[in-house]
Each structure stands twice: as structure tokens, then as C-alpha cells.
């Protein structure tokens, strides 16, 4: 069994981004990511801090806008509009979840597609579905693909199962795997018999937010397992959606949690931001 070490790969990517940023600075461009946080969700605050720290590590300027929980939708839209028209800002990220009185879809669509480094804008989703690399790809699925590529895992002809059908991970992940030549099944909350799919799979990607959802009796020998889940137990320990101890015994490759997909997600956010800055140069 080989661990898919996202922490090590993300560190390597950050070093490469440092060099790219030094080149851009020599041309008068400083990569800049604007992050908007609405409210005081503790998990969101932690994520925003980690993103700001990661930006600093590879020479990206980060602007954090921490807005009050009672910020109106129009006030948030006005800030995004200002950032859309600010040429010194190359990426805009709105930290989810948003308060209930704000429409998430409307907010995400208001970010200009050329600064949508999360890859959620309908235009960027369209590029992905057409198999084009013109736009930005969602960070978590992109991070998974880079991780698999780094370990020279050939996806062509693989039977792949994705557990979870969210717009953030499951759906774009399915499209990327399809574009890479895999045969893809997407399972979700209404799937009748999950094991029927997982037992036949060469590759399983789990993104459901459910502890121990994937157990060893549900997988075949030699399976490749990517665990996107992040769950905090009462003890404070962070675990994924996979029973790691048992499933790893049957896996050829598996991601740890933490240290697998999480660091890659942030690395891809940074990479998309630098890509946007480079587009400005071109």
C-alpha cells in the first residue's frame, strides 16, 4: 500500500509557485487573492487563516474581508463588484457557507469568471464540461487529479466510483475523470446499494461527510482510494469518510486524512490565482 501524500506534493507546488511569482513581480505584477468571509463561523475562520498563510508562503498577496453576519446581500454584491473591477486583484473567493439570508448561487455567479479561482462560475463549469482548459477548474477535484498524476496512476479504462454528487466535488470530479478516459459511476444519498458499485471499482473517491462510510468489506483488493471527507470526532481528532485502518489493508494507493486531499485543495487555489495573474501578463 502506498500513501498518496498530498502534503508533500503541495509543498513542492508551493515552491514552484514561488518562482513563478518572482518572475511575475519582475514584470510588475503581484499575484493577489481576495477572500471574503461573512460571519463568525469558526471552521470558516480557520480555513480563511490557512489560505492567507498559504498565500504568504508562496508570495501571493492576500486581502481578507471579514464582514458582519448581518451584511446584506446587496452589500456583499457591491464589494464583489469593486473587486471585479480592481486590476490588482487576480482571484476572488467567497468562503462558504454563507448566512441563510444570502443566496449562494447569486453571489458565486457575480464573481467575474476570469477571477473565479474556485472554479464555480457557470462559464468555468461550461469550459470543464466541454473538456476545455480555458477557465479555472474547481480546486478539490483538480487537486485529486494532480495527486493521481504525480503517482503515475493511469486513469484510462479504470472503473471509477464517486460517492457524493455535490457541485463542489462530486460532479466536477466525475467530469474530470470522464475526460481522462475513466468509466465513471456517481453514487449519492439515494443510491440503493452502494457496495454494488464500490466492490467493482478500481478507483473510489469519497466526498460525503460521513465517518466510516467506506469499509473494507465494500472494496476489492488493489483498489485506489481517495478520501475527500473531513470530519471532526468528539475527541477532536480529524478523520475522513473511509475506515482508513481496515480499507488501507486492501488498497494499492490511499490518501490519509489529514495530509491527503486537503493540502492539495489549497495548493490548487494558489495555482489558479497565479494562473489568473499570468493571464493578466499575457
Swiss-Prot record:
Pfam families: THF_DHG_CYH, THF_DHG_CYH_C. GO terms for biological process: L-histidine biosynthetic process; methionine biosynthetic process; purine nucleotide biosynthetic process; tetrahydrofolate interconversion. GO terms for molecular function: methenyltetrahydrofolate cyclohydrolase activity; methylenetetrahydrofolate dehydrogenase (NADP+) activity. Its EC number is 1.5.1.5, 3.5.4.9. InterPro entries: Aminoacid_DH-like_N_sf, NAD(P)-bd_dom_sf, THF_DH/CycHdrlase, THF_DH/CycHdrlase_cat_dom, THF_DH/CycHdrlase_CS, THF_DH/CycHdrlase_NAD-bd_dom. Belongs to the tetrahydrofolate dehydrogenase/cyclohydrolase family. Homodimer. Catalyzes the oxidation of 5,10-methylenetetrahydrofolate to 5,10-methenyltetrahydrofolate and then the hydrolysis of 5,10-methenyltetrahydrofolate to 10-formyltetrahydrofolate. This is Bifunctional protein FolD. It comes from Campylobacter jejuni subsp. jejuni serotype O:23/36 (strain 81-176). The gene is folD.
